[in-house]
Design a protein with these regions (language model features):
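Glycine-rich phosphate/adenosyl-contacting loop at the front of the ribokinase-like
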Residues: 1-60, 65-76, 237
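Ribokinase/PfkB-type carbohydrate-kinase core domain
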Residues: 1-10, 71-86, 98-228, 294-297
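Conserved phosphate-binding/catalytic region of the ribokinase-like
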Residues: 1-4, 168, 195-298
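Aromatic/hydrophobic pocket-lining residues that form π-stacking "cages" and hydrophobic walls in ligand
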Residues: 44-45, 70, 148-150, 269
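Gly/Ala-rich phosphate-binding loop of Rossmann-like dinucleotide-binding domains
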Residues: 49-50, 153, 256
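Short, glycine-/polar-rich solvent-exposed loops and beta-turns at beta-strand/coil boundaries
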Residues: 88-90
Length: 298
Protein backbone atom coordinates (compact mmCIF):
# COMPACT_ATOMS: atom_id res chain seq x y z
CA UNK A 1 0.00 0.00 0.00
CA UNK A 2 1.32 3.43 -0.97
CA UNK A 3 1.74 5.93 1.87
CA UNK A 4 0.94 9.48 0.77
CA UNK A 5 1.18 12.76 2.70
CA UNK A 6 -0.78 15.70 1.30
CA UNK A 7 -0.02 19.26 2.41
CA UNK A 8 -2.73 21.60 1.22
CA UNK A 9 -6.08 23.31 1.32
CA UNK A 10 -9.48 22.15 2.54
CA UNK A 11 -12.57 23.98 1.27
CA UNK A 12 -16.30 23.72 1.21
CA UNK A 13 -17.32 24.00 -2.44
CA UNK A 14 -20.48 26.03 -3.08
CA UNK A 15 -21.52 24.68 -6.47
CA UNK A 16 -24.07 26.23 -8.83
CA UNK A 17 -25.05 24.46 -12.03
CA UNK A 18 -26.13 26.92 -14.71
CA UNK A 19 -27.04 26.81 -18.40
CA UNK A 20 -24.13 29.15 -19.15
CA UNK A 21 -21.70 31.53 -17.46
CA UNK A 22 -22.97 35.03 -16.69
CA UNK A 23 -21.49 38.28 -17.98
CA UNK A 24 -20.69 41.38 -15.86
CA UNK A 25 -23.83 42.80 -14.24
CA UNK A 26 -25.99 39.95 -15.54
CA UNK A 27 -28.40 37.77 -13.54
CA UNK A 28 -29.65 34.40 -14.77
CA UNK A 29 -31.51 31.50 -13.18
CA UNK A 30 -29.37 28.56 -12.11
CA UNK A 31 -30.39 24.93 -12.36
CA UNK A 32 -29.06 23.42 -9.12
CA UNK A 33 -27.10 24.37 -5.98
CA UNK A 34 -25.02 22.04 -3.82
CA UNK A 35 -22.47 22.23 -1.03
CA UNK A 36 -19.69 19.71 -1.56
CA UNK A 37 -16.27 19.07 0.02
CA UNK A 38 -13.28 20.39 -1.91
CA UNK A 39 -9.95 22.21 -1.77
CA UNK A 40 -6.94 20.93 -3.69
CA UNK A 41 -5.35 19.33 -0.65
CA UNK A 42 -8.51 17.59 0.49
CA UNK A 43 -9.40 16.53 -3.05
CA UNK A 44 -5.99 14.96 -3.60
CA UNK A 45 -6.13 13.25 -0.20
CA UNK A 46 -9.56 11.75 -0.90
CA UNK A 47 -8.60 10.67 -4.43
CA UNK A 48 -5.47 8.93 -3.15
CA UNK A 49 -7.39 7.23 -0.33
CA UNK A 50 -10.06 5.95 -2.73
CA UNK A 51 -7.29 4.45 -4.87
CA UNK A 52 -6.17 2.42 -1.87
CA UNK A 53 -3.37 4.54 -0.41
CA UNK A 54 -2.80 5.26 3.26
CA UNK A 55 -3.17 9.05 3.36
CA UNK A 56 -2.40 11.76 5.92
CA UNK A 57 -3.38 15.39 5.39
CA UNK A 58 -1.62 18.49 6.74
CA UNK A 59 -3.89 21.54 6.69
CA UNK A 60 -6.29 23.75 8.66
CA UNK A 61 -10.02 24.21 9.18
CA UNK A 62 -12.08 26.79 10.98
CA UNK A 63 -14.02 25.84 14.11
CA UNK A 64 -17.32 26.31 12.27
CA UNK A 65 -20.10 24.29 10.68
CA UNK A 66 -18.23 23.85 7.38
CA UNK A 67 -15.12 22.77 9.29
CA UNK A 68 -17.04 20.13 11.22
CA UNK A 69 -18.64 18.77 8.05
CA UNK A 70 -15.35 18.70 6.16
CA UNK A 71 -13.47 16.99 8.99
CA UNK A 72 -16.17 14.33 9.30
CA UNK A 73 -16.19 13.72 5.56
CA UNK A 74 -12.41 13.31 5.37
CA UNK A 75 -12.46 10.91 8.31
CA UNK A 76 -15.14 8.84 6.57
CA UNK A 77 -12.86 8.59 3.51
CA UNK A 78 -10.11 7.17 5.74
CA UNK A 79 -7.82 10.22 5.63
CA UNK A 80 -5.67 10.68 8.76
CA UNK A 81 -6.32 14.13 10.26
CA UNK A 82 -3.93 14.40 13.22
CA UNK A 83 -2.12 17.26 11.45
CA UNK A 84 -5.21 19.23 10.43
CA UNK A 85 -5.43 22.22 12.77
CA UNK A 86 -8.76 23.51 14.11
CA UNK A 87 -8.63 27.34 14.27
CA UNK A 88 -11.20 29.00 16.51
CA UNK A 89 -10.61 32.48 15.10
CA UNK A 90 -10.77 31.66 11.38
CA UNK A 91 -13.48 30.54 8.97
CA UNK A 92 -13.00 27.40 6.91
CA UNK A 93 -12.02 27.95 3.29
CA UNK A 94 -14.69 28.15 0.62
CA UNK A 95 -14.80 27.94 -3.17
CA UNK A 96 -17.72 29.36 -5.14
CA UNK A 97 -17.97 27.26 -8.30
CA UNK A 98 -20.20 27.77 -11.32
CA UNK A 99 -20.51 24.76 -13.62
CA UNK A 100 -21.82 25.20 -17.18
CA UNK A 101 -21.36 22.95 -20.18
CA UNK A 102 -18.87 20.72 -18.39
CA UNK A 103 -16.52 23.65 -17.65
CA UNK A 104 -16.18 25.65 -14.45
CA UNK A 105 -15.34 29.06 -13.02
CA UNK A 106 -14.06 29.24 -9.43
CA UNK A 107 -13.52 31.93 -6.77
CA UNK A 108 -11.64 30.73 -3.67
CA UNK A 109 -11.71 32.43 -0.25
CA UNK A 110 -8.79 30.81 1.65
CA UNK A 111 -9.94 31.28 5.25
CA UNK A 112 -8.04 28.87 7.51
CA UNK A 113 -5.96 27.65 4.56
CA UNK A 114 -4.04 30.93 4.70
CA UNK A 115 -2.75 29.87 8.12
CA UNK A 116 -1.24 26.48 7.31
CA UNK A 117 2.30 26.89 8.67
CA UNK A 118 5.80 25.51 8.11
CA UNK A 119 5.68 24.39 11.75
CA UNK A 120 2.85 22.00 10.86
CA UNK A 121 5.04 20.51 8.14
CA UNK A 122 7.92 20.11 10.60
CA UNK A 123 5.57 18.44 13.07
CA UNK A 124 4.67 15.92 10.36
CA UNK A 125 8.37 15.03 9.87
CA UNK A 126 7.94 11.40 10.91
CA UNK A 127 4.95 10.92 8.59
CA UNK A 128 6.76 12.46 5.65
CA UNK A 129 9.87 10.38 6.31
CA UNK A 130 7.81 7.17 5.98
CA UNK A 131 5.84 8.34 2.94
CA UNK A 132 6.23 7.02 -0.60
CA UNK A 133 5.33 10.46 -1.97
CA UNK A 134 4.26 13.93 -0.82
CA UNK A 135 1.74 16.12 -2.65
CA UNK A 136 1.66 19.90 -2.20
CA UNK A 137 -0.26 22.65 -4.00
CA UNK A 138 -0.34 26.44 -3.81
CA UNK A 139 -3.65 27.29 -2.11
CA UNK A 140 -1.66 27.58 1.13
CA UNK A 141 1.11 30.08 2.11
CA UNK A 142 4.22 29.86 -0.05
CA UNK A 143 6.56 29.53 2.93
CA UNK A 144 4.68 26.34 3.81
CA UNK A 145 5.01 25.09 0.24
CA UNK A 146 8.74 25.78 0.41
CA UNK A 147 9.07 23.99 3.76
CA UNK A 148 7.33 20.94 2.30
CA UNK A 149 9.53 20.77 -0.79
CA UNK A 150 12.72 21.25 1.21
CA UNK A 151 11.83 18.68 3.88
CA UNK A 152 10.82 16.06 1.33
CA UNK A 153 14.03 16.58 -0.61
CA UNK A 154 16.14 16.37 2.55
CA UNK A 155 14.45 13.11 3.53
CA UNK A 156 14.71 11.64 0.02
CA UNK A 157 10.93 11.43 -0.37
CA UNK A 158 9.50 12.34 -3.81
CA UNK A 159 7.58 15.63 -3.68
CA UNK A 160 5.01 16.31 -6.40
CA UNK A 161 4.46 20.07 -6.62
CA UNK A 162 1.13 20.96 -8.21
CA UNK A 163 1.61 24.70 -8.95
CA UNK A 164 -2.01 25.80 -8.81
CA UNK A 165 -2.94 28.58 -8.60
CA UNK A 166 0.30 29.38 -10.40
CA UNK A 167 2.87 32.07 -9.79
CA UNK A 168 6.55 32.36 -10.60
CA UNK A 169 8.64 30.34 -8.16
CA UNK A 170 12.36 30.40 -7.32
CA UNK A 171 14.36 27.99 -9.45
CA UNK A 172 15.79 26.21 -6.41
CA UNK A 173 12.29 25.23 -5.23
CA UNK A 174 11.54 23.67 -8.59
CA UNK A 175 14.87 21.84 -8.61
CA UNK A 176 14.05 20.25 -5.24
CA UNK A 177 10.69 18.86 -6.36
CA UNK A 178 10.74 15.38 -7.91
CA UNK A 179 7.99 16.39 -10.36
CA UNK A 180 6.09 19.58 -11.10
CA UNK A 181 2.59 19.08 -12.55
CA UNK A 182 1.31 22.26 -14.24
CA UNK A 183 -0.98 22.81 -17.17
CA UNK A 184 0.43 24.86 -20.06
CA UNK A 185 -0.72 28.20 -18.64
CA UNK A 186 0.71 27.39 -15.21
CA UNK A 187 4.04 26.26 -16.68
CA UNK A 188 4.45 29.56 -18.53
CA UNK A 189 3.77 31.49 -15.32
CA UNK A 190 6.22 29.32 -13.35
CA UNK A 191 8.99 30.05 -15.85
CA UNK A 192 8.04 33.68 -16.51
CA UNK A 193 7.59 32.74 -20.18
CA UNK A 194 5.20 33.63 -22.99
CA UNK A 195 2.09 31.42 -22.59
CA UNK A 196 1.88 31.10 -26.38
CA UNK A 197 5.33 29.50 -26.56
CA UNK A 198 5.26 25.82 -27.52
CA UNK A 199 4.72 23.79 -24.36
CA UNK A 200 7.31 21.17 -25.37
CA UNK A 201 9.94 23.91 -25.52
CA UNK A 202 8.83 25.17 -22.11
CA UNK A 203 9.08 21.67 -20.67
CA UNK A 204 12.68 21.36 -21.86
CA UNK A 205 13.52 24.74 -20.34
CA UNK A 206 12.15 23.79 -16.93
CA UNK A 207 14.78 23.16 -14.22
CA UNK A 208 13.00 19.99 -13.07
CA UNK A 209 11.06 17.02 -14.46
CA UNK A 210 7.61 18.16 -15.65
CA UNK A 211 4.33 16.28 -16.03
CA UNK A 212 2.15 18.63 -18.08
CA UNK A 213 -1.61 18.13 -18.01
CA UNK A 214 -3.59 18.89 -21.18
CA UNK A 215 -7.17 18.14 -20.16
CA UNK A 216 -8.91 15.78 -22.55
CA UNK A 217 -5.75 15.55 -24.67
CA UNK A 218 -4.00 13.68 -21.86
CA UNK A 219 -0.57 14.57 -20.50
CA UNK A 220 3.03 15.08 -21.54
CA UNK A 221 5.90 14.08 -19.30
CA UNK A 222 9.62 14.53 -19.36
CA UNK A 223 12.49 13.44 -17.12
CA UNK A 224 15.30 13.63 -19.68
CA UNK A 225 15.34 14.13 -23.42
CA UNK A 226 12.21 14.75 -25.48
CA UNK A 227 8.78 15.00 -23.81
CA UNK A 228 6.58 11.90 -24.14
CA UNK A 229 2.80 11.91 -24.65
CA UNK A 230 0.05 9.94 -22.94
CA UNK A 231 -3.25 10.28 -24.78
CA UNK A 232 -6.41 11.18 -22.90
CA UNK A 233 -9.50 8.97 -22.67
CA UNK A 234 -12.83 9.86 -24.26
CA UNK A 235 -15.66 10.14 -21.73
CA UNK A 236 -18.88 12.10 -21.32
CA UNK A 237 -17.91 15.21 -19.33
CA UNK A 238 -20.33 16.26 -16.59
CA UNK A 239 -18.06 18.37 -14.36
CA UNK A 240 -14.31 18.93 -14.75
CA UNK A 241 -13.88 20.23 -11.18
CA UNK A 242 -11.29 18.11 -9.39
CA UNK A 243 -9.92 16.36 -12.48
CA UNK A 244 -6.46 17.82 -11.96
CA UNK A 245 -6.52 16.83 -8.29
CA UNK A 246 -7.49 13.28 -9.19
CA UNK A 247 -4.65 13.20 -11.74
CA UNK A 248 -2.09 14.33 -9.17
CA UNK A 249 -3.30 11.88 -6.55
CA UNK A 250 -3.15 8.93 -8.94
CA UNK A 251 0.30 10.00 -10.11
CA UNK A 252 1.52 9.90 -6.51
CA UNK A 253 -0.17 6.59 -5.70
CA UNK A 254 1.22 4.77 -8.75
CA UNK A 255 4.59 6.50 -9.00
CA UNK A 256 6.34 3.37 -7.71
CA UNK A 257 5.27 1.60 -10.94
CA UNK A 258 7.35 4.00 -13.05
CA UNK A 259 6.49 7.40 -14.46
CA UNK A 260 4.95 6.24 -17.75
CA UNK A 261 2.54 3.77 -16.09
CA UNK A 262 1.70 6.29 -13.39
CA UNK A 263 0.84 8.98 -15.96
CA UNK A 264 -1.39 6.56 -17.88
CA UNK A 265 -3.29 5.60 -14.74
CA UNK A 266 -3.50 9.26 -13.71
CA UNK A 267 -5.06 10.19 -17.06
CA UNK A 268 -7.58 7.37 -16.71
CA UNK A 269 -8.49 8.33 -13.14
CA UNK A 270 -8.92 11.97 -14.17
CA UNK A 271 -11.15 10.93 -17.08
CA UNK A 272 -13.41 8.94 -14.77
CA UNK A 273 -13.58 11.83 -12.31
CA UNK A 274 -15.25 14.18 -14.79
CA UNK A 275 -18.16 11.82 -15.46
CA UNK A 276 -19.95 12.77 -12.21
CA UNK A 277 -20.74 16.04 -10.45
CA UNK A 278 -18.44 17.52 -7.82
CA UNK A 279 -14.72 17.67 -7.20
CA UNK A 280 -14.82 14.42 -5.21
CA UNK A 281 -18.01 12.91 -6.63
CA UNK A 282 -16.39 11.09 -9.54
CA UNK A 283 -13.07 10.03 -8.02
CA UNK A 284 -12.68 6.31 -8.81
CA UNK A 285 -11.67 3.38 -6.67
CA UNK A 286 -9.05 0.85 -7.81
CA UNK A 287 -11.59 -1.64 -9.21
CA UNK A 288 -13.35 1.00 -11.33
CA UNK A 289 -9.99 2.27 -12.57
CA UNK A 290 -8.73 -1.22 -13.45
CA UNK A 291 -11.99 -2.06 -15.26
CA UNK A 292 -11.85 1.18 -17.23
CA UNK A 293 -8.24 0.58 -18.29
CA UNK A 294 -9.04 -3.00 -19.27
CA UNK A 295 -11.96 -1.77 -21.37
CA UNK A 296 -9.71 0.78 -23.09
CA UNK A 297 -7.10 -1.89 -23.81
CA UNK A 298 -9.76 -4.14 -25.32
Amino acid sequence: MSRIVVVGSINMDLVTQAPRFVGPGETILGERFLTMPGGKGANQAVAAARLGAEVALVGALGDDAFGQQLRAGLATEGVHLDHVARLADSASGTASITVAGGENQIIVVPGANARVTPAQVDNAHALIERANAVLVQMEIPLDTVEATVRLGHRLGVPVILNPAPAQKLPTDWLQLARYVTPNQHELAILLGADPDEDFRTLMQRAPCPVVLTRGGEGAWYREQGEPLHQSGFKVHVVDSTGAGDTFNAALAVFLHEGLGRAVRKACAAAALSVTRLGAQGGMPGPQELDAFLAQQAG
